[in-house]
A protein has these predicted regions:
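Ribosome-associated RNA-binding proteins
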Residues: 2-291
Length: 291
């Protein structure tokens, strides 16, 4: 007597996912052109966590100390003075609840050594709050999880403000890019063009994810070059988005009154509360355990 096994389509999909391994075969089949939708869906702050999230943040830079002591109230104050952000916790402090991230692609890269080929994994991660802030991170590591984790940190450090505007009359909230902007990486050139309200984002899947995370609702795009190279395509789009604040429009021609940099304004506070946290951590890690 033969045995007949019945399985539902959901069980078959789960079995295929378990066999597939690294998120759709490392981007095979389509080169990031939209197949395997929802690969990174749900990868918000709630998707990852553990012991690292339970620890209290101890800032190690002057900017981090000013942020934690509530001397700096928003990210815009940091961008106004072009202060470099060296700690990803600063972005979590301001955008923690609204920040979402998505893995664009994971691909294997190889290096020829004397012992043979060394394979590592390269992760591309986009991050944004869907309201005027977006970042892109690229990380290569021996393990997929380590690469994704490192790419998320680098994406947070690269978060930039996004300038939004109107296509026609200034009615309602800004919904598109204020002017035509162009970004480039390698041979890929991406151009963002303002669009009427209700048009949506007319683009390939990769720029569409970045533009949605940036909070742009309507936009036309034009791309040329080898757009099949997902890394350069994403970097060119991110470059175009970051250039929205690189030019002046007539409404910004009026004279800007600059104030003191936070480092100058809170010099006494930084000098009074200074502690060498990084040195203490290094010494504690270097002390061997004796029984």
């Amino acid at each position: 007597m033969g045995l007949h096994l019945l399985c539902s389509p959901q069980m078959a999909d789960d079995a295929g996912a378990n066999r597939g391994g690294f998120r759709g075969g490392f981007g095979s089949g389509g080169r990031g052109r939209g197949r395997g939708r929802g690969r990174g869906r749900g990868r918000g702050r709630g998707a990852r966590g553990g012991k690292a999230d339970d620890k209290e943040w101890v800032p190690v830079t002057k900017l981090g100390r000013l942020v934690k002591d509530m001397k700096i109230k928003s990210l815009e104050e940091i961008y106004l003075f072009s202060l470099p952000i060296k700690e990803s916790e600063i972005i979590d402090f301001f955008l923690g609840t609204s920040l979402k991230d998505e893995v664009l692609k994971i691909m294997p890269v190889q290096k020829q050594t004397r012992a043979g080929q060394r394979t590592r994994f390269k992760a591309f991660v986009a991050i944004g709050d869907f309201n005027g802030h977006v970042g892109l991170g690229v990380k290569c590591s021996k393990e997929v999880a380590t690469a994704i984790r490192g790419a998320i940190i680098l994406a947070k450090l690269s978060v930039v403000p996004v300038r939004r505007g109107y296509w026609g009359n200034k009615i309602g909230k800004p919904h598109t890019v204020p002017c035509k902007v162009t970004g480039r990486c390698g041979s890929v050139l991406v151009r963002l063009i303002p669009a009427p309200r209700g048009t949506g984002i007319v683009s390939a899947p990769v720029p569409k994810k970045l533009l949605m995370m940036a909070g742009i609702d309507d936009c036309y795009t034009s791309a040329r070059g080898c757009t099949a190279t997902l890394g350069n395509f994403a970097k060119a789009t991110f470059d175009a988005i970051s250039r929205t604040y690189s030019y002046l429009t007539p409404d910004l021609w009026k004279e800007t009154v600059f104030t003191k940099s936070p480092y100058q304004e809170y010099t006494d506070h930084l000098a009074k509360n200074h502690t060498r946290v990084s040195v203490q951590r290094t010494q504690a890690a270097a002390v061997p355990a004796t029984s």
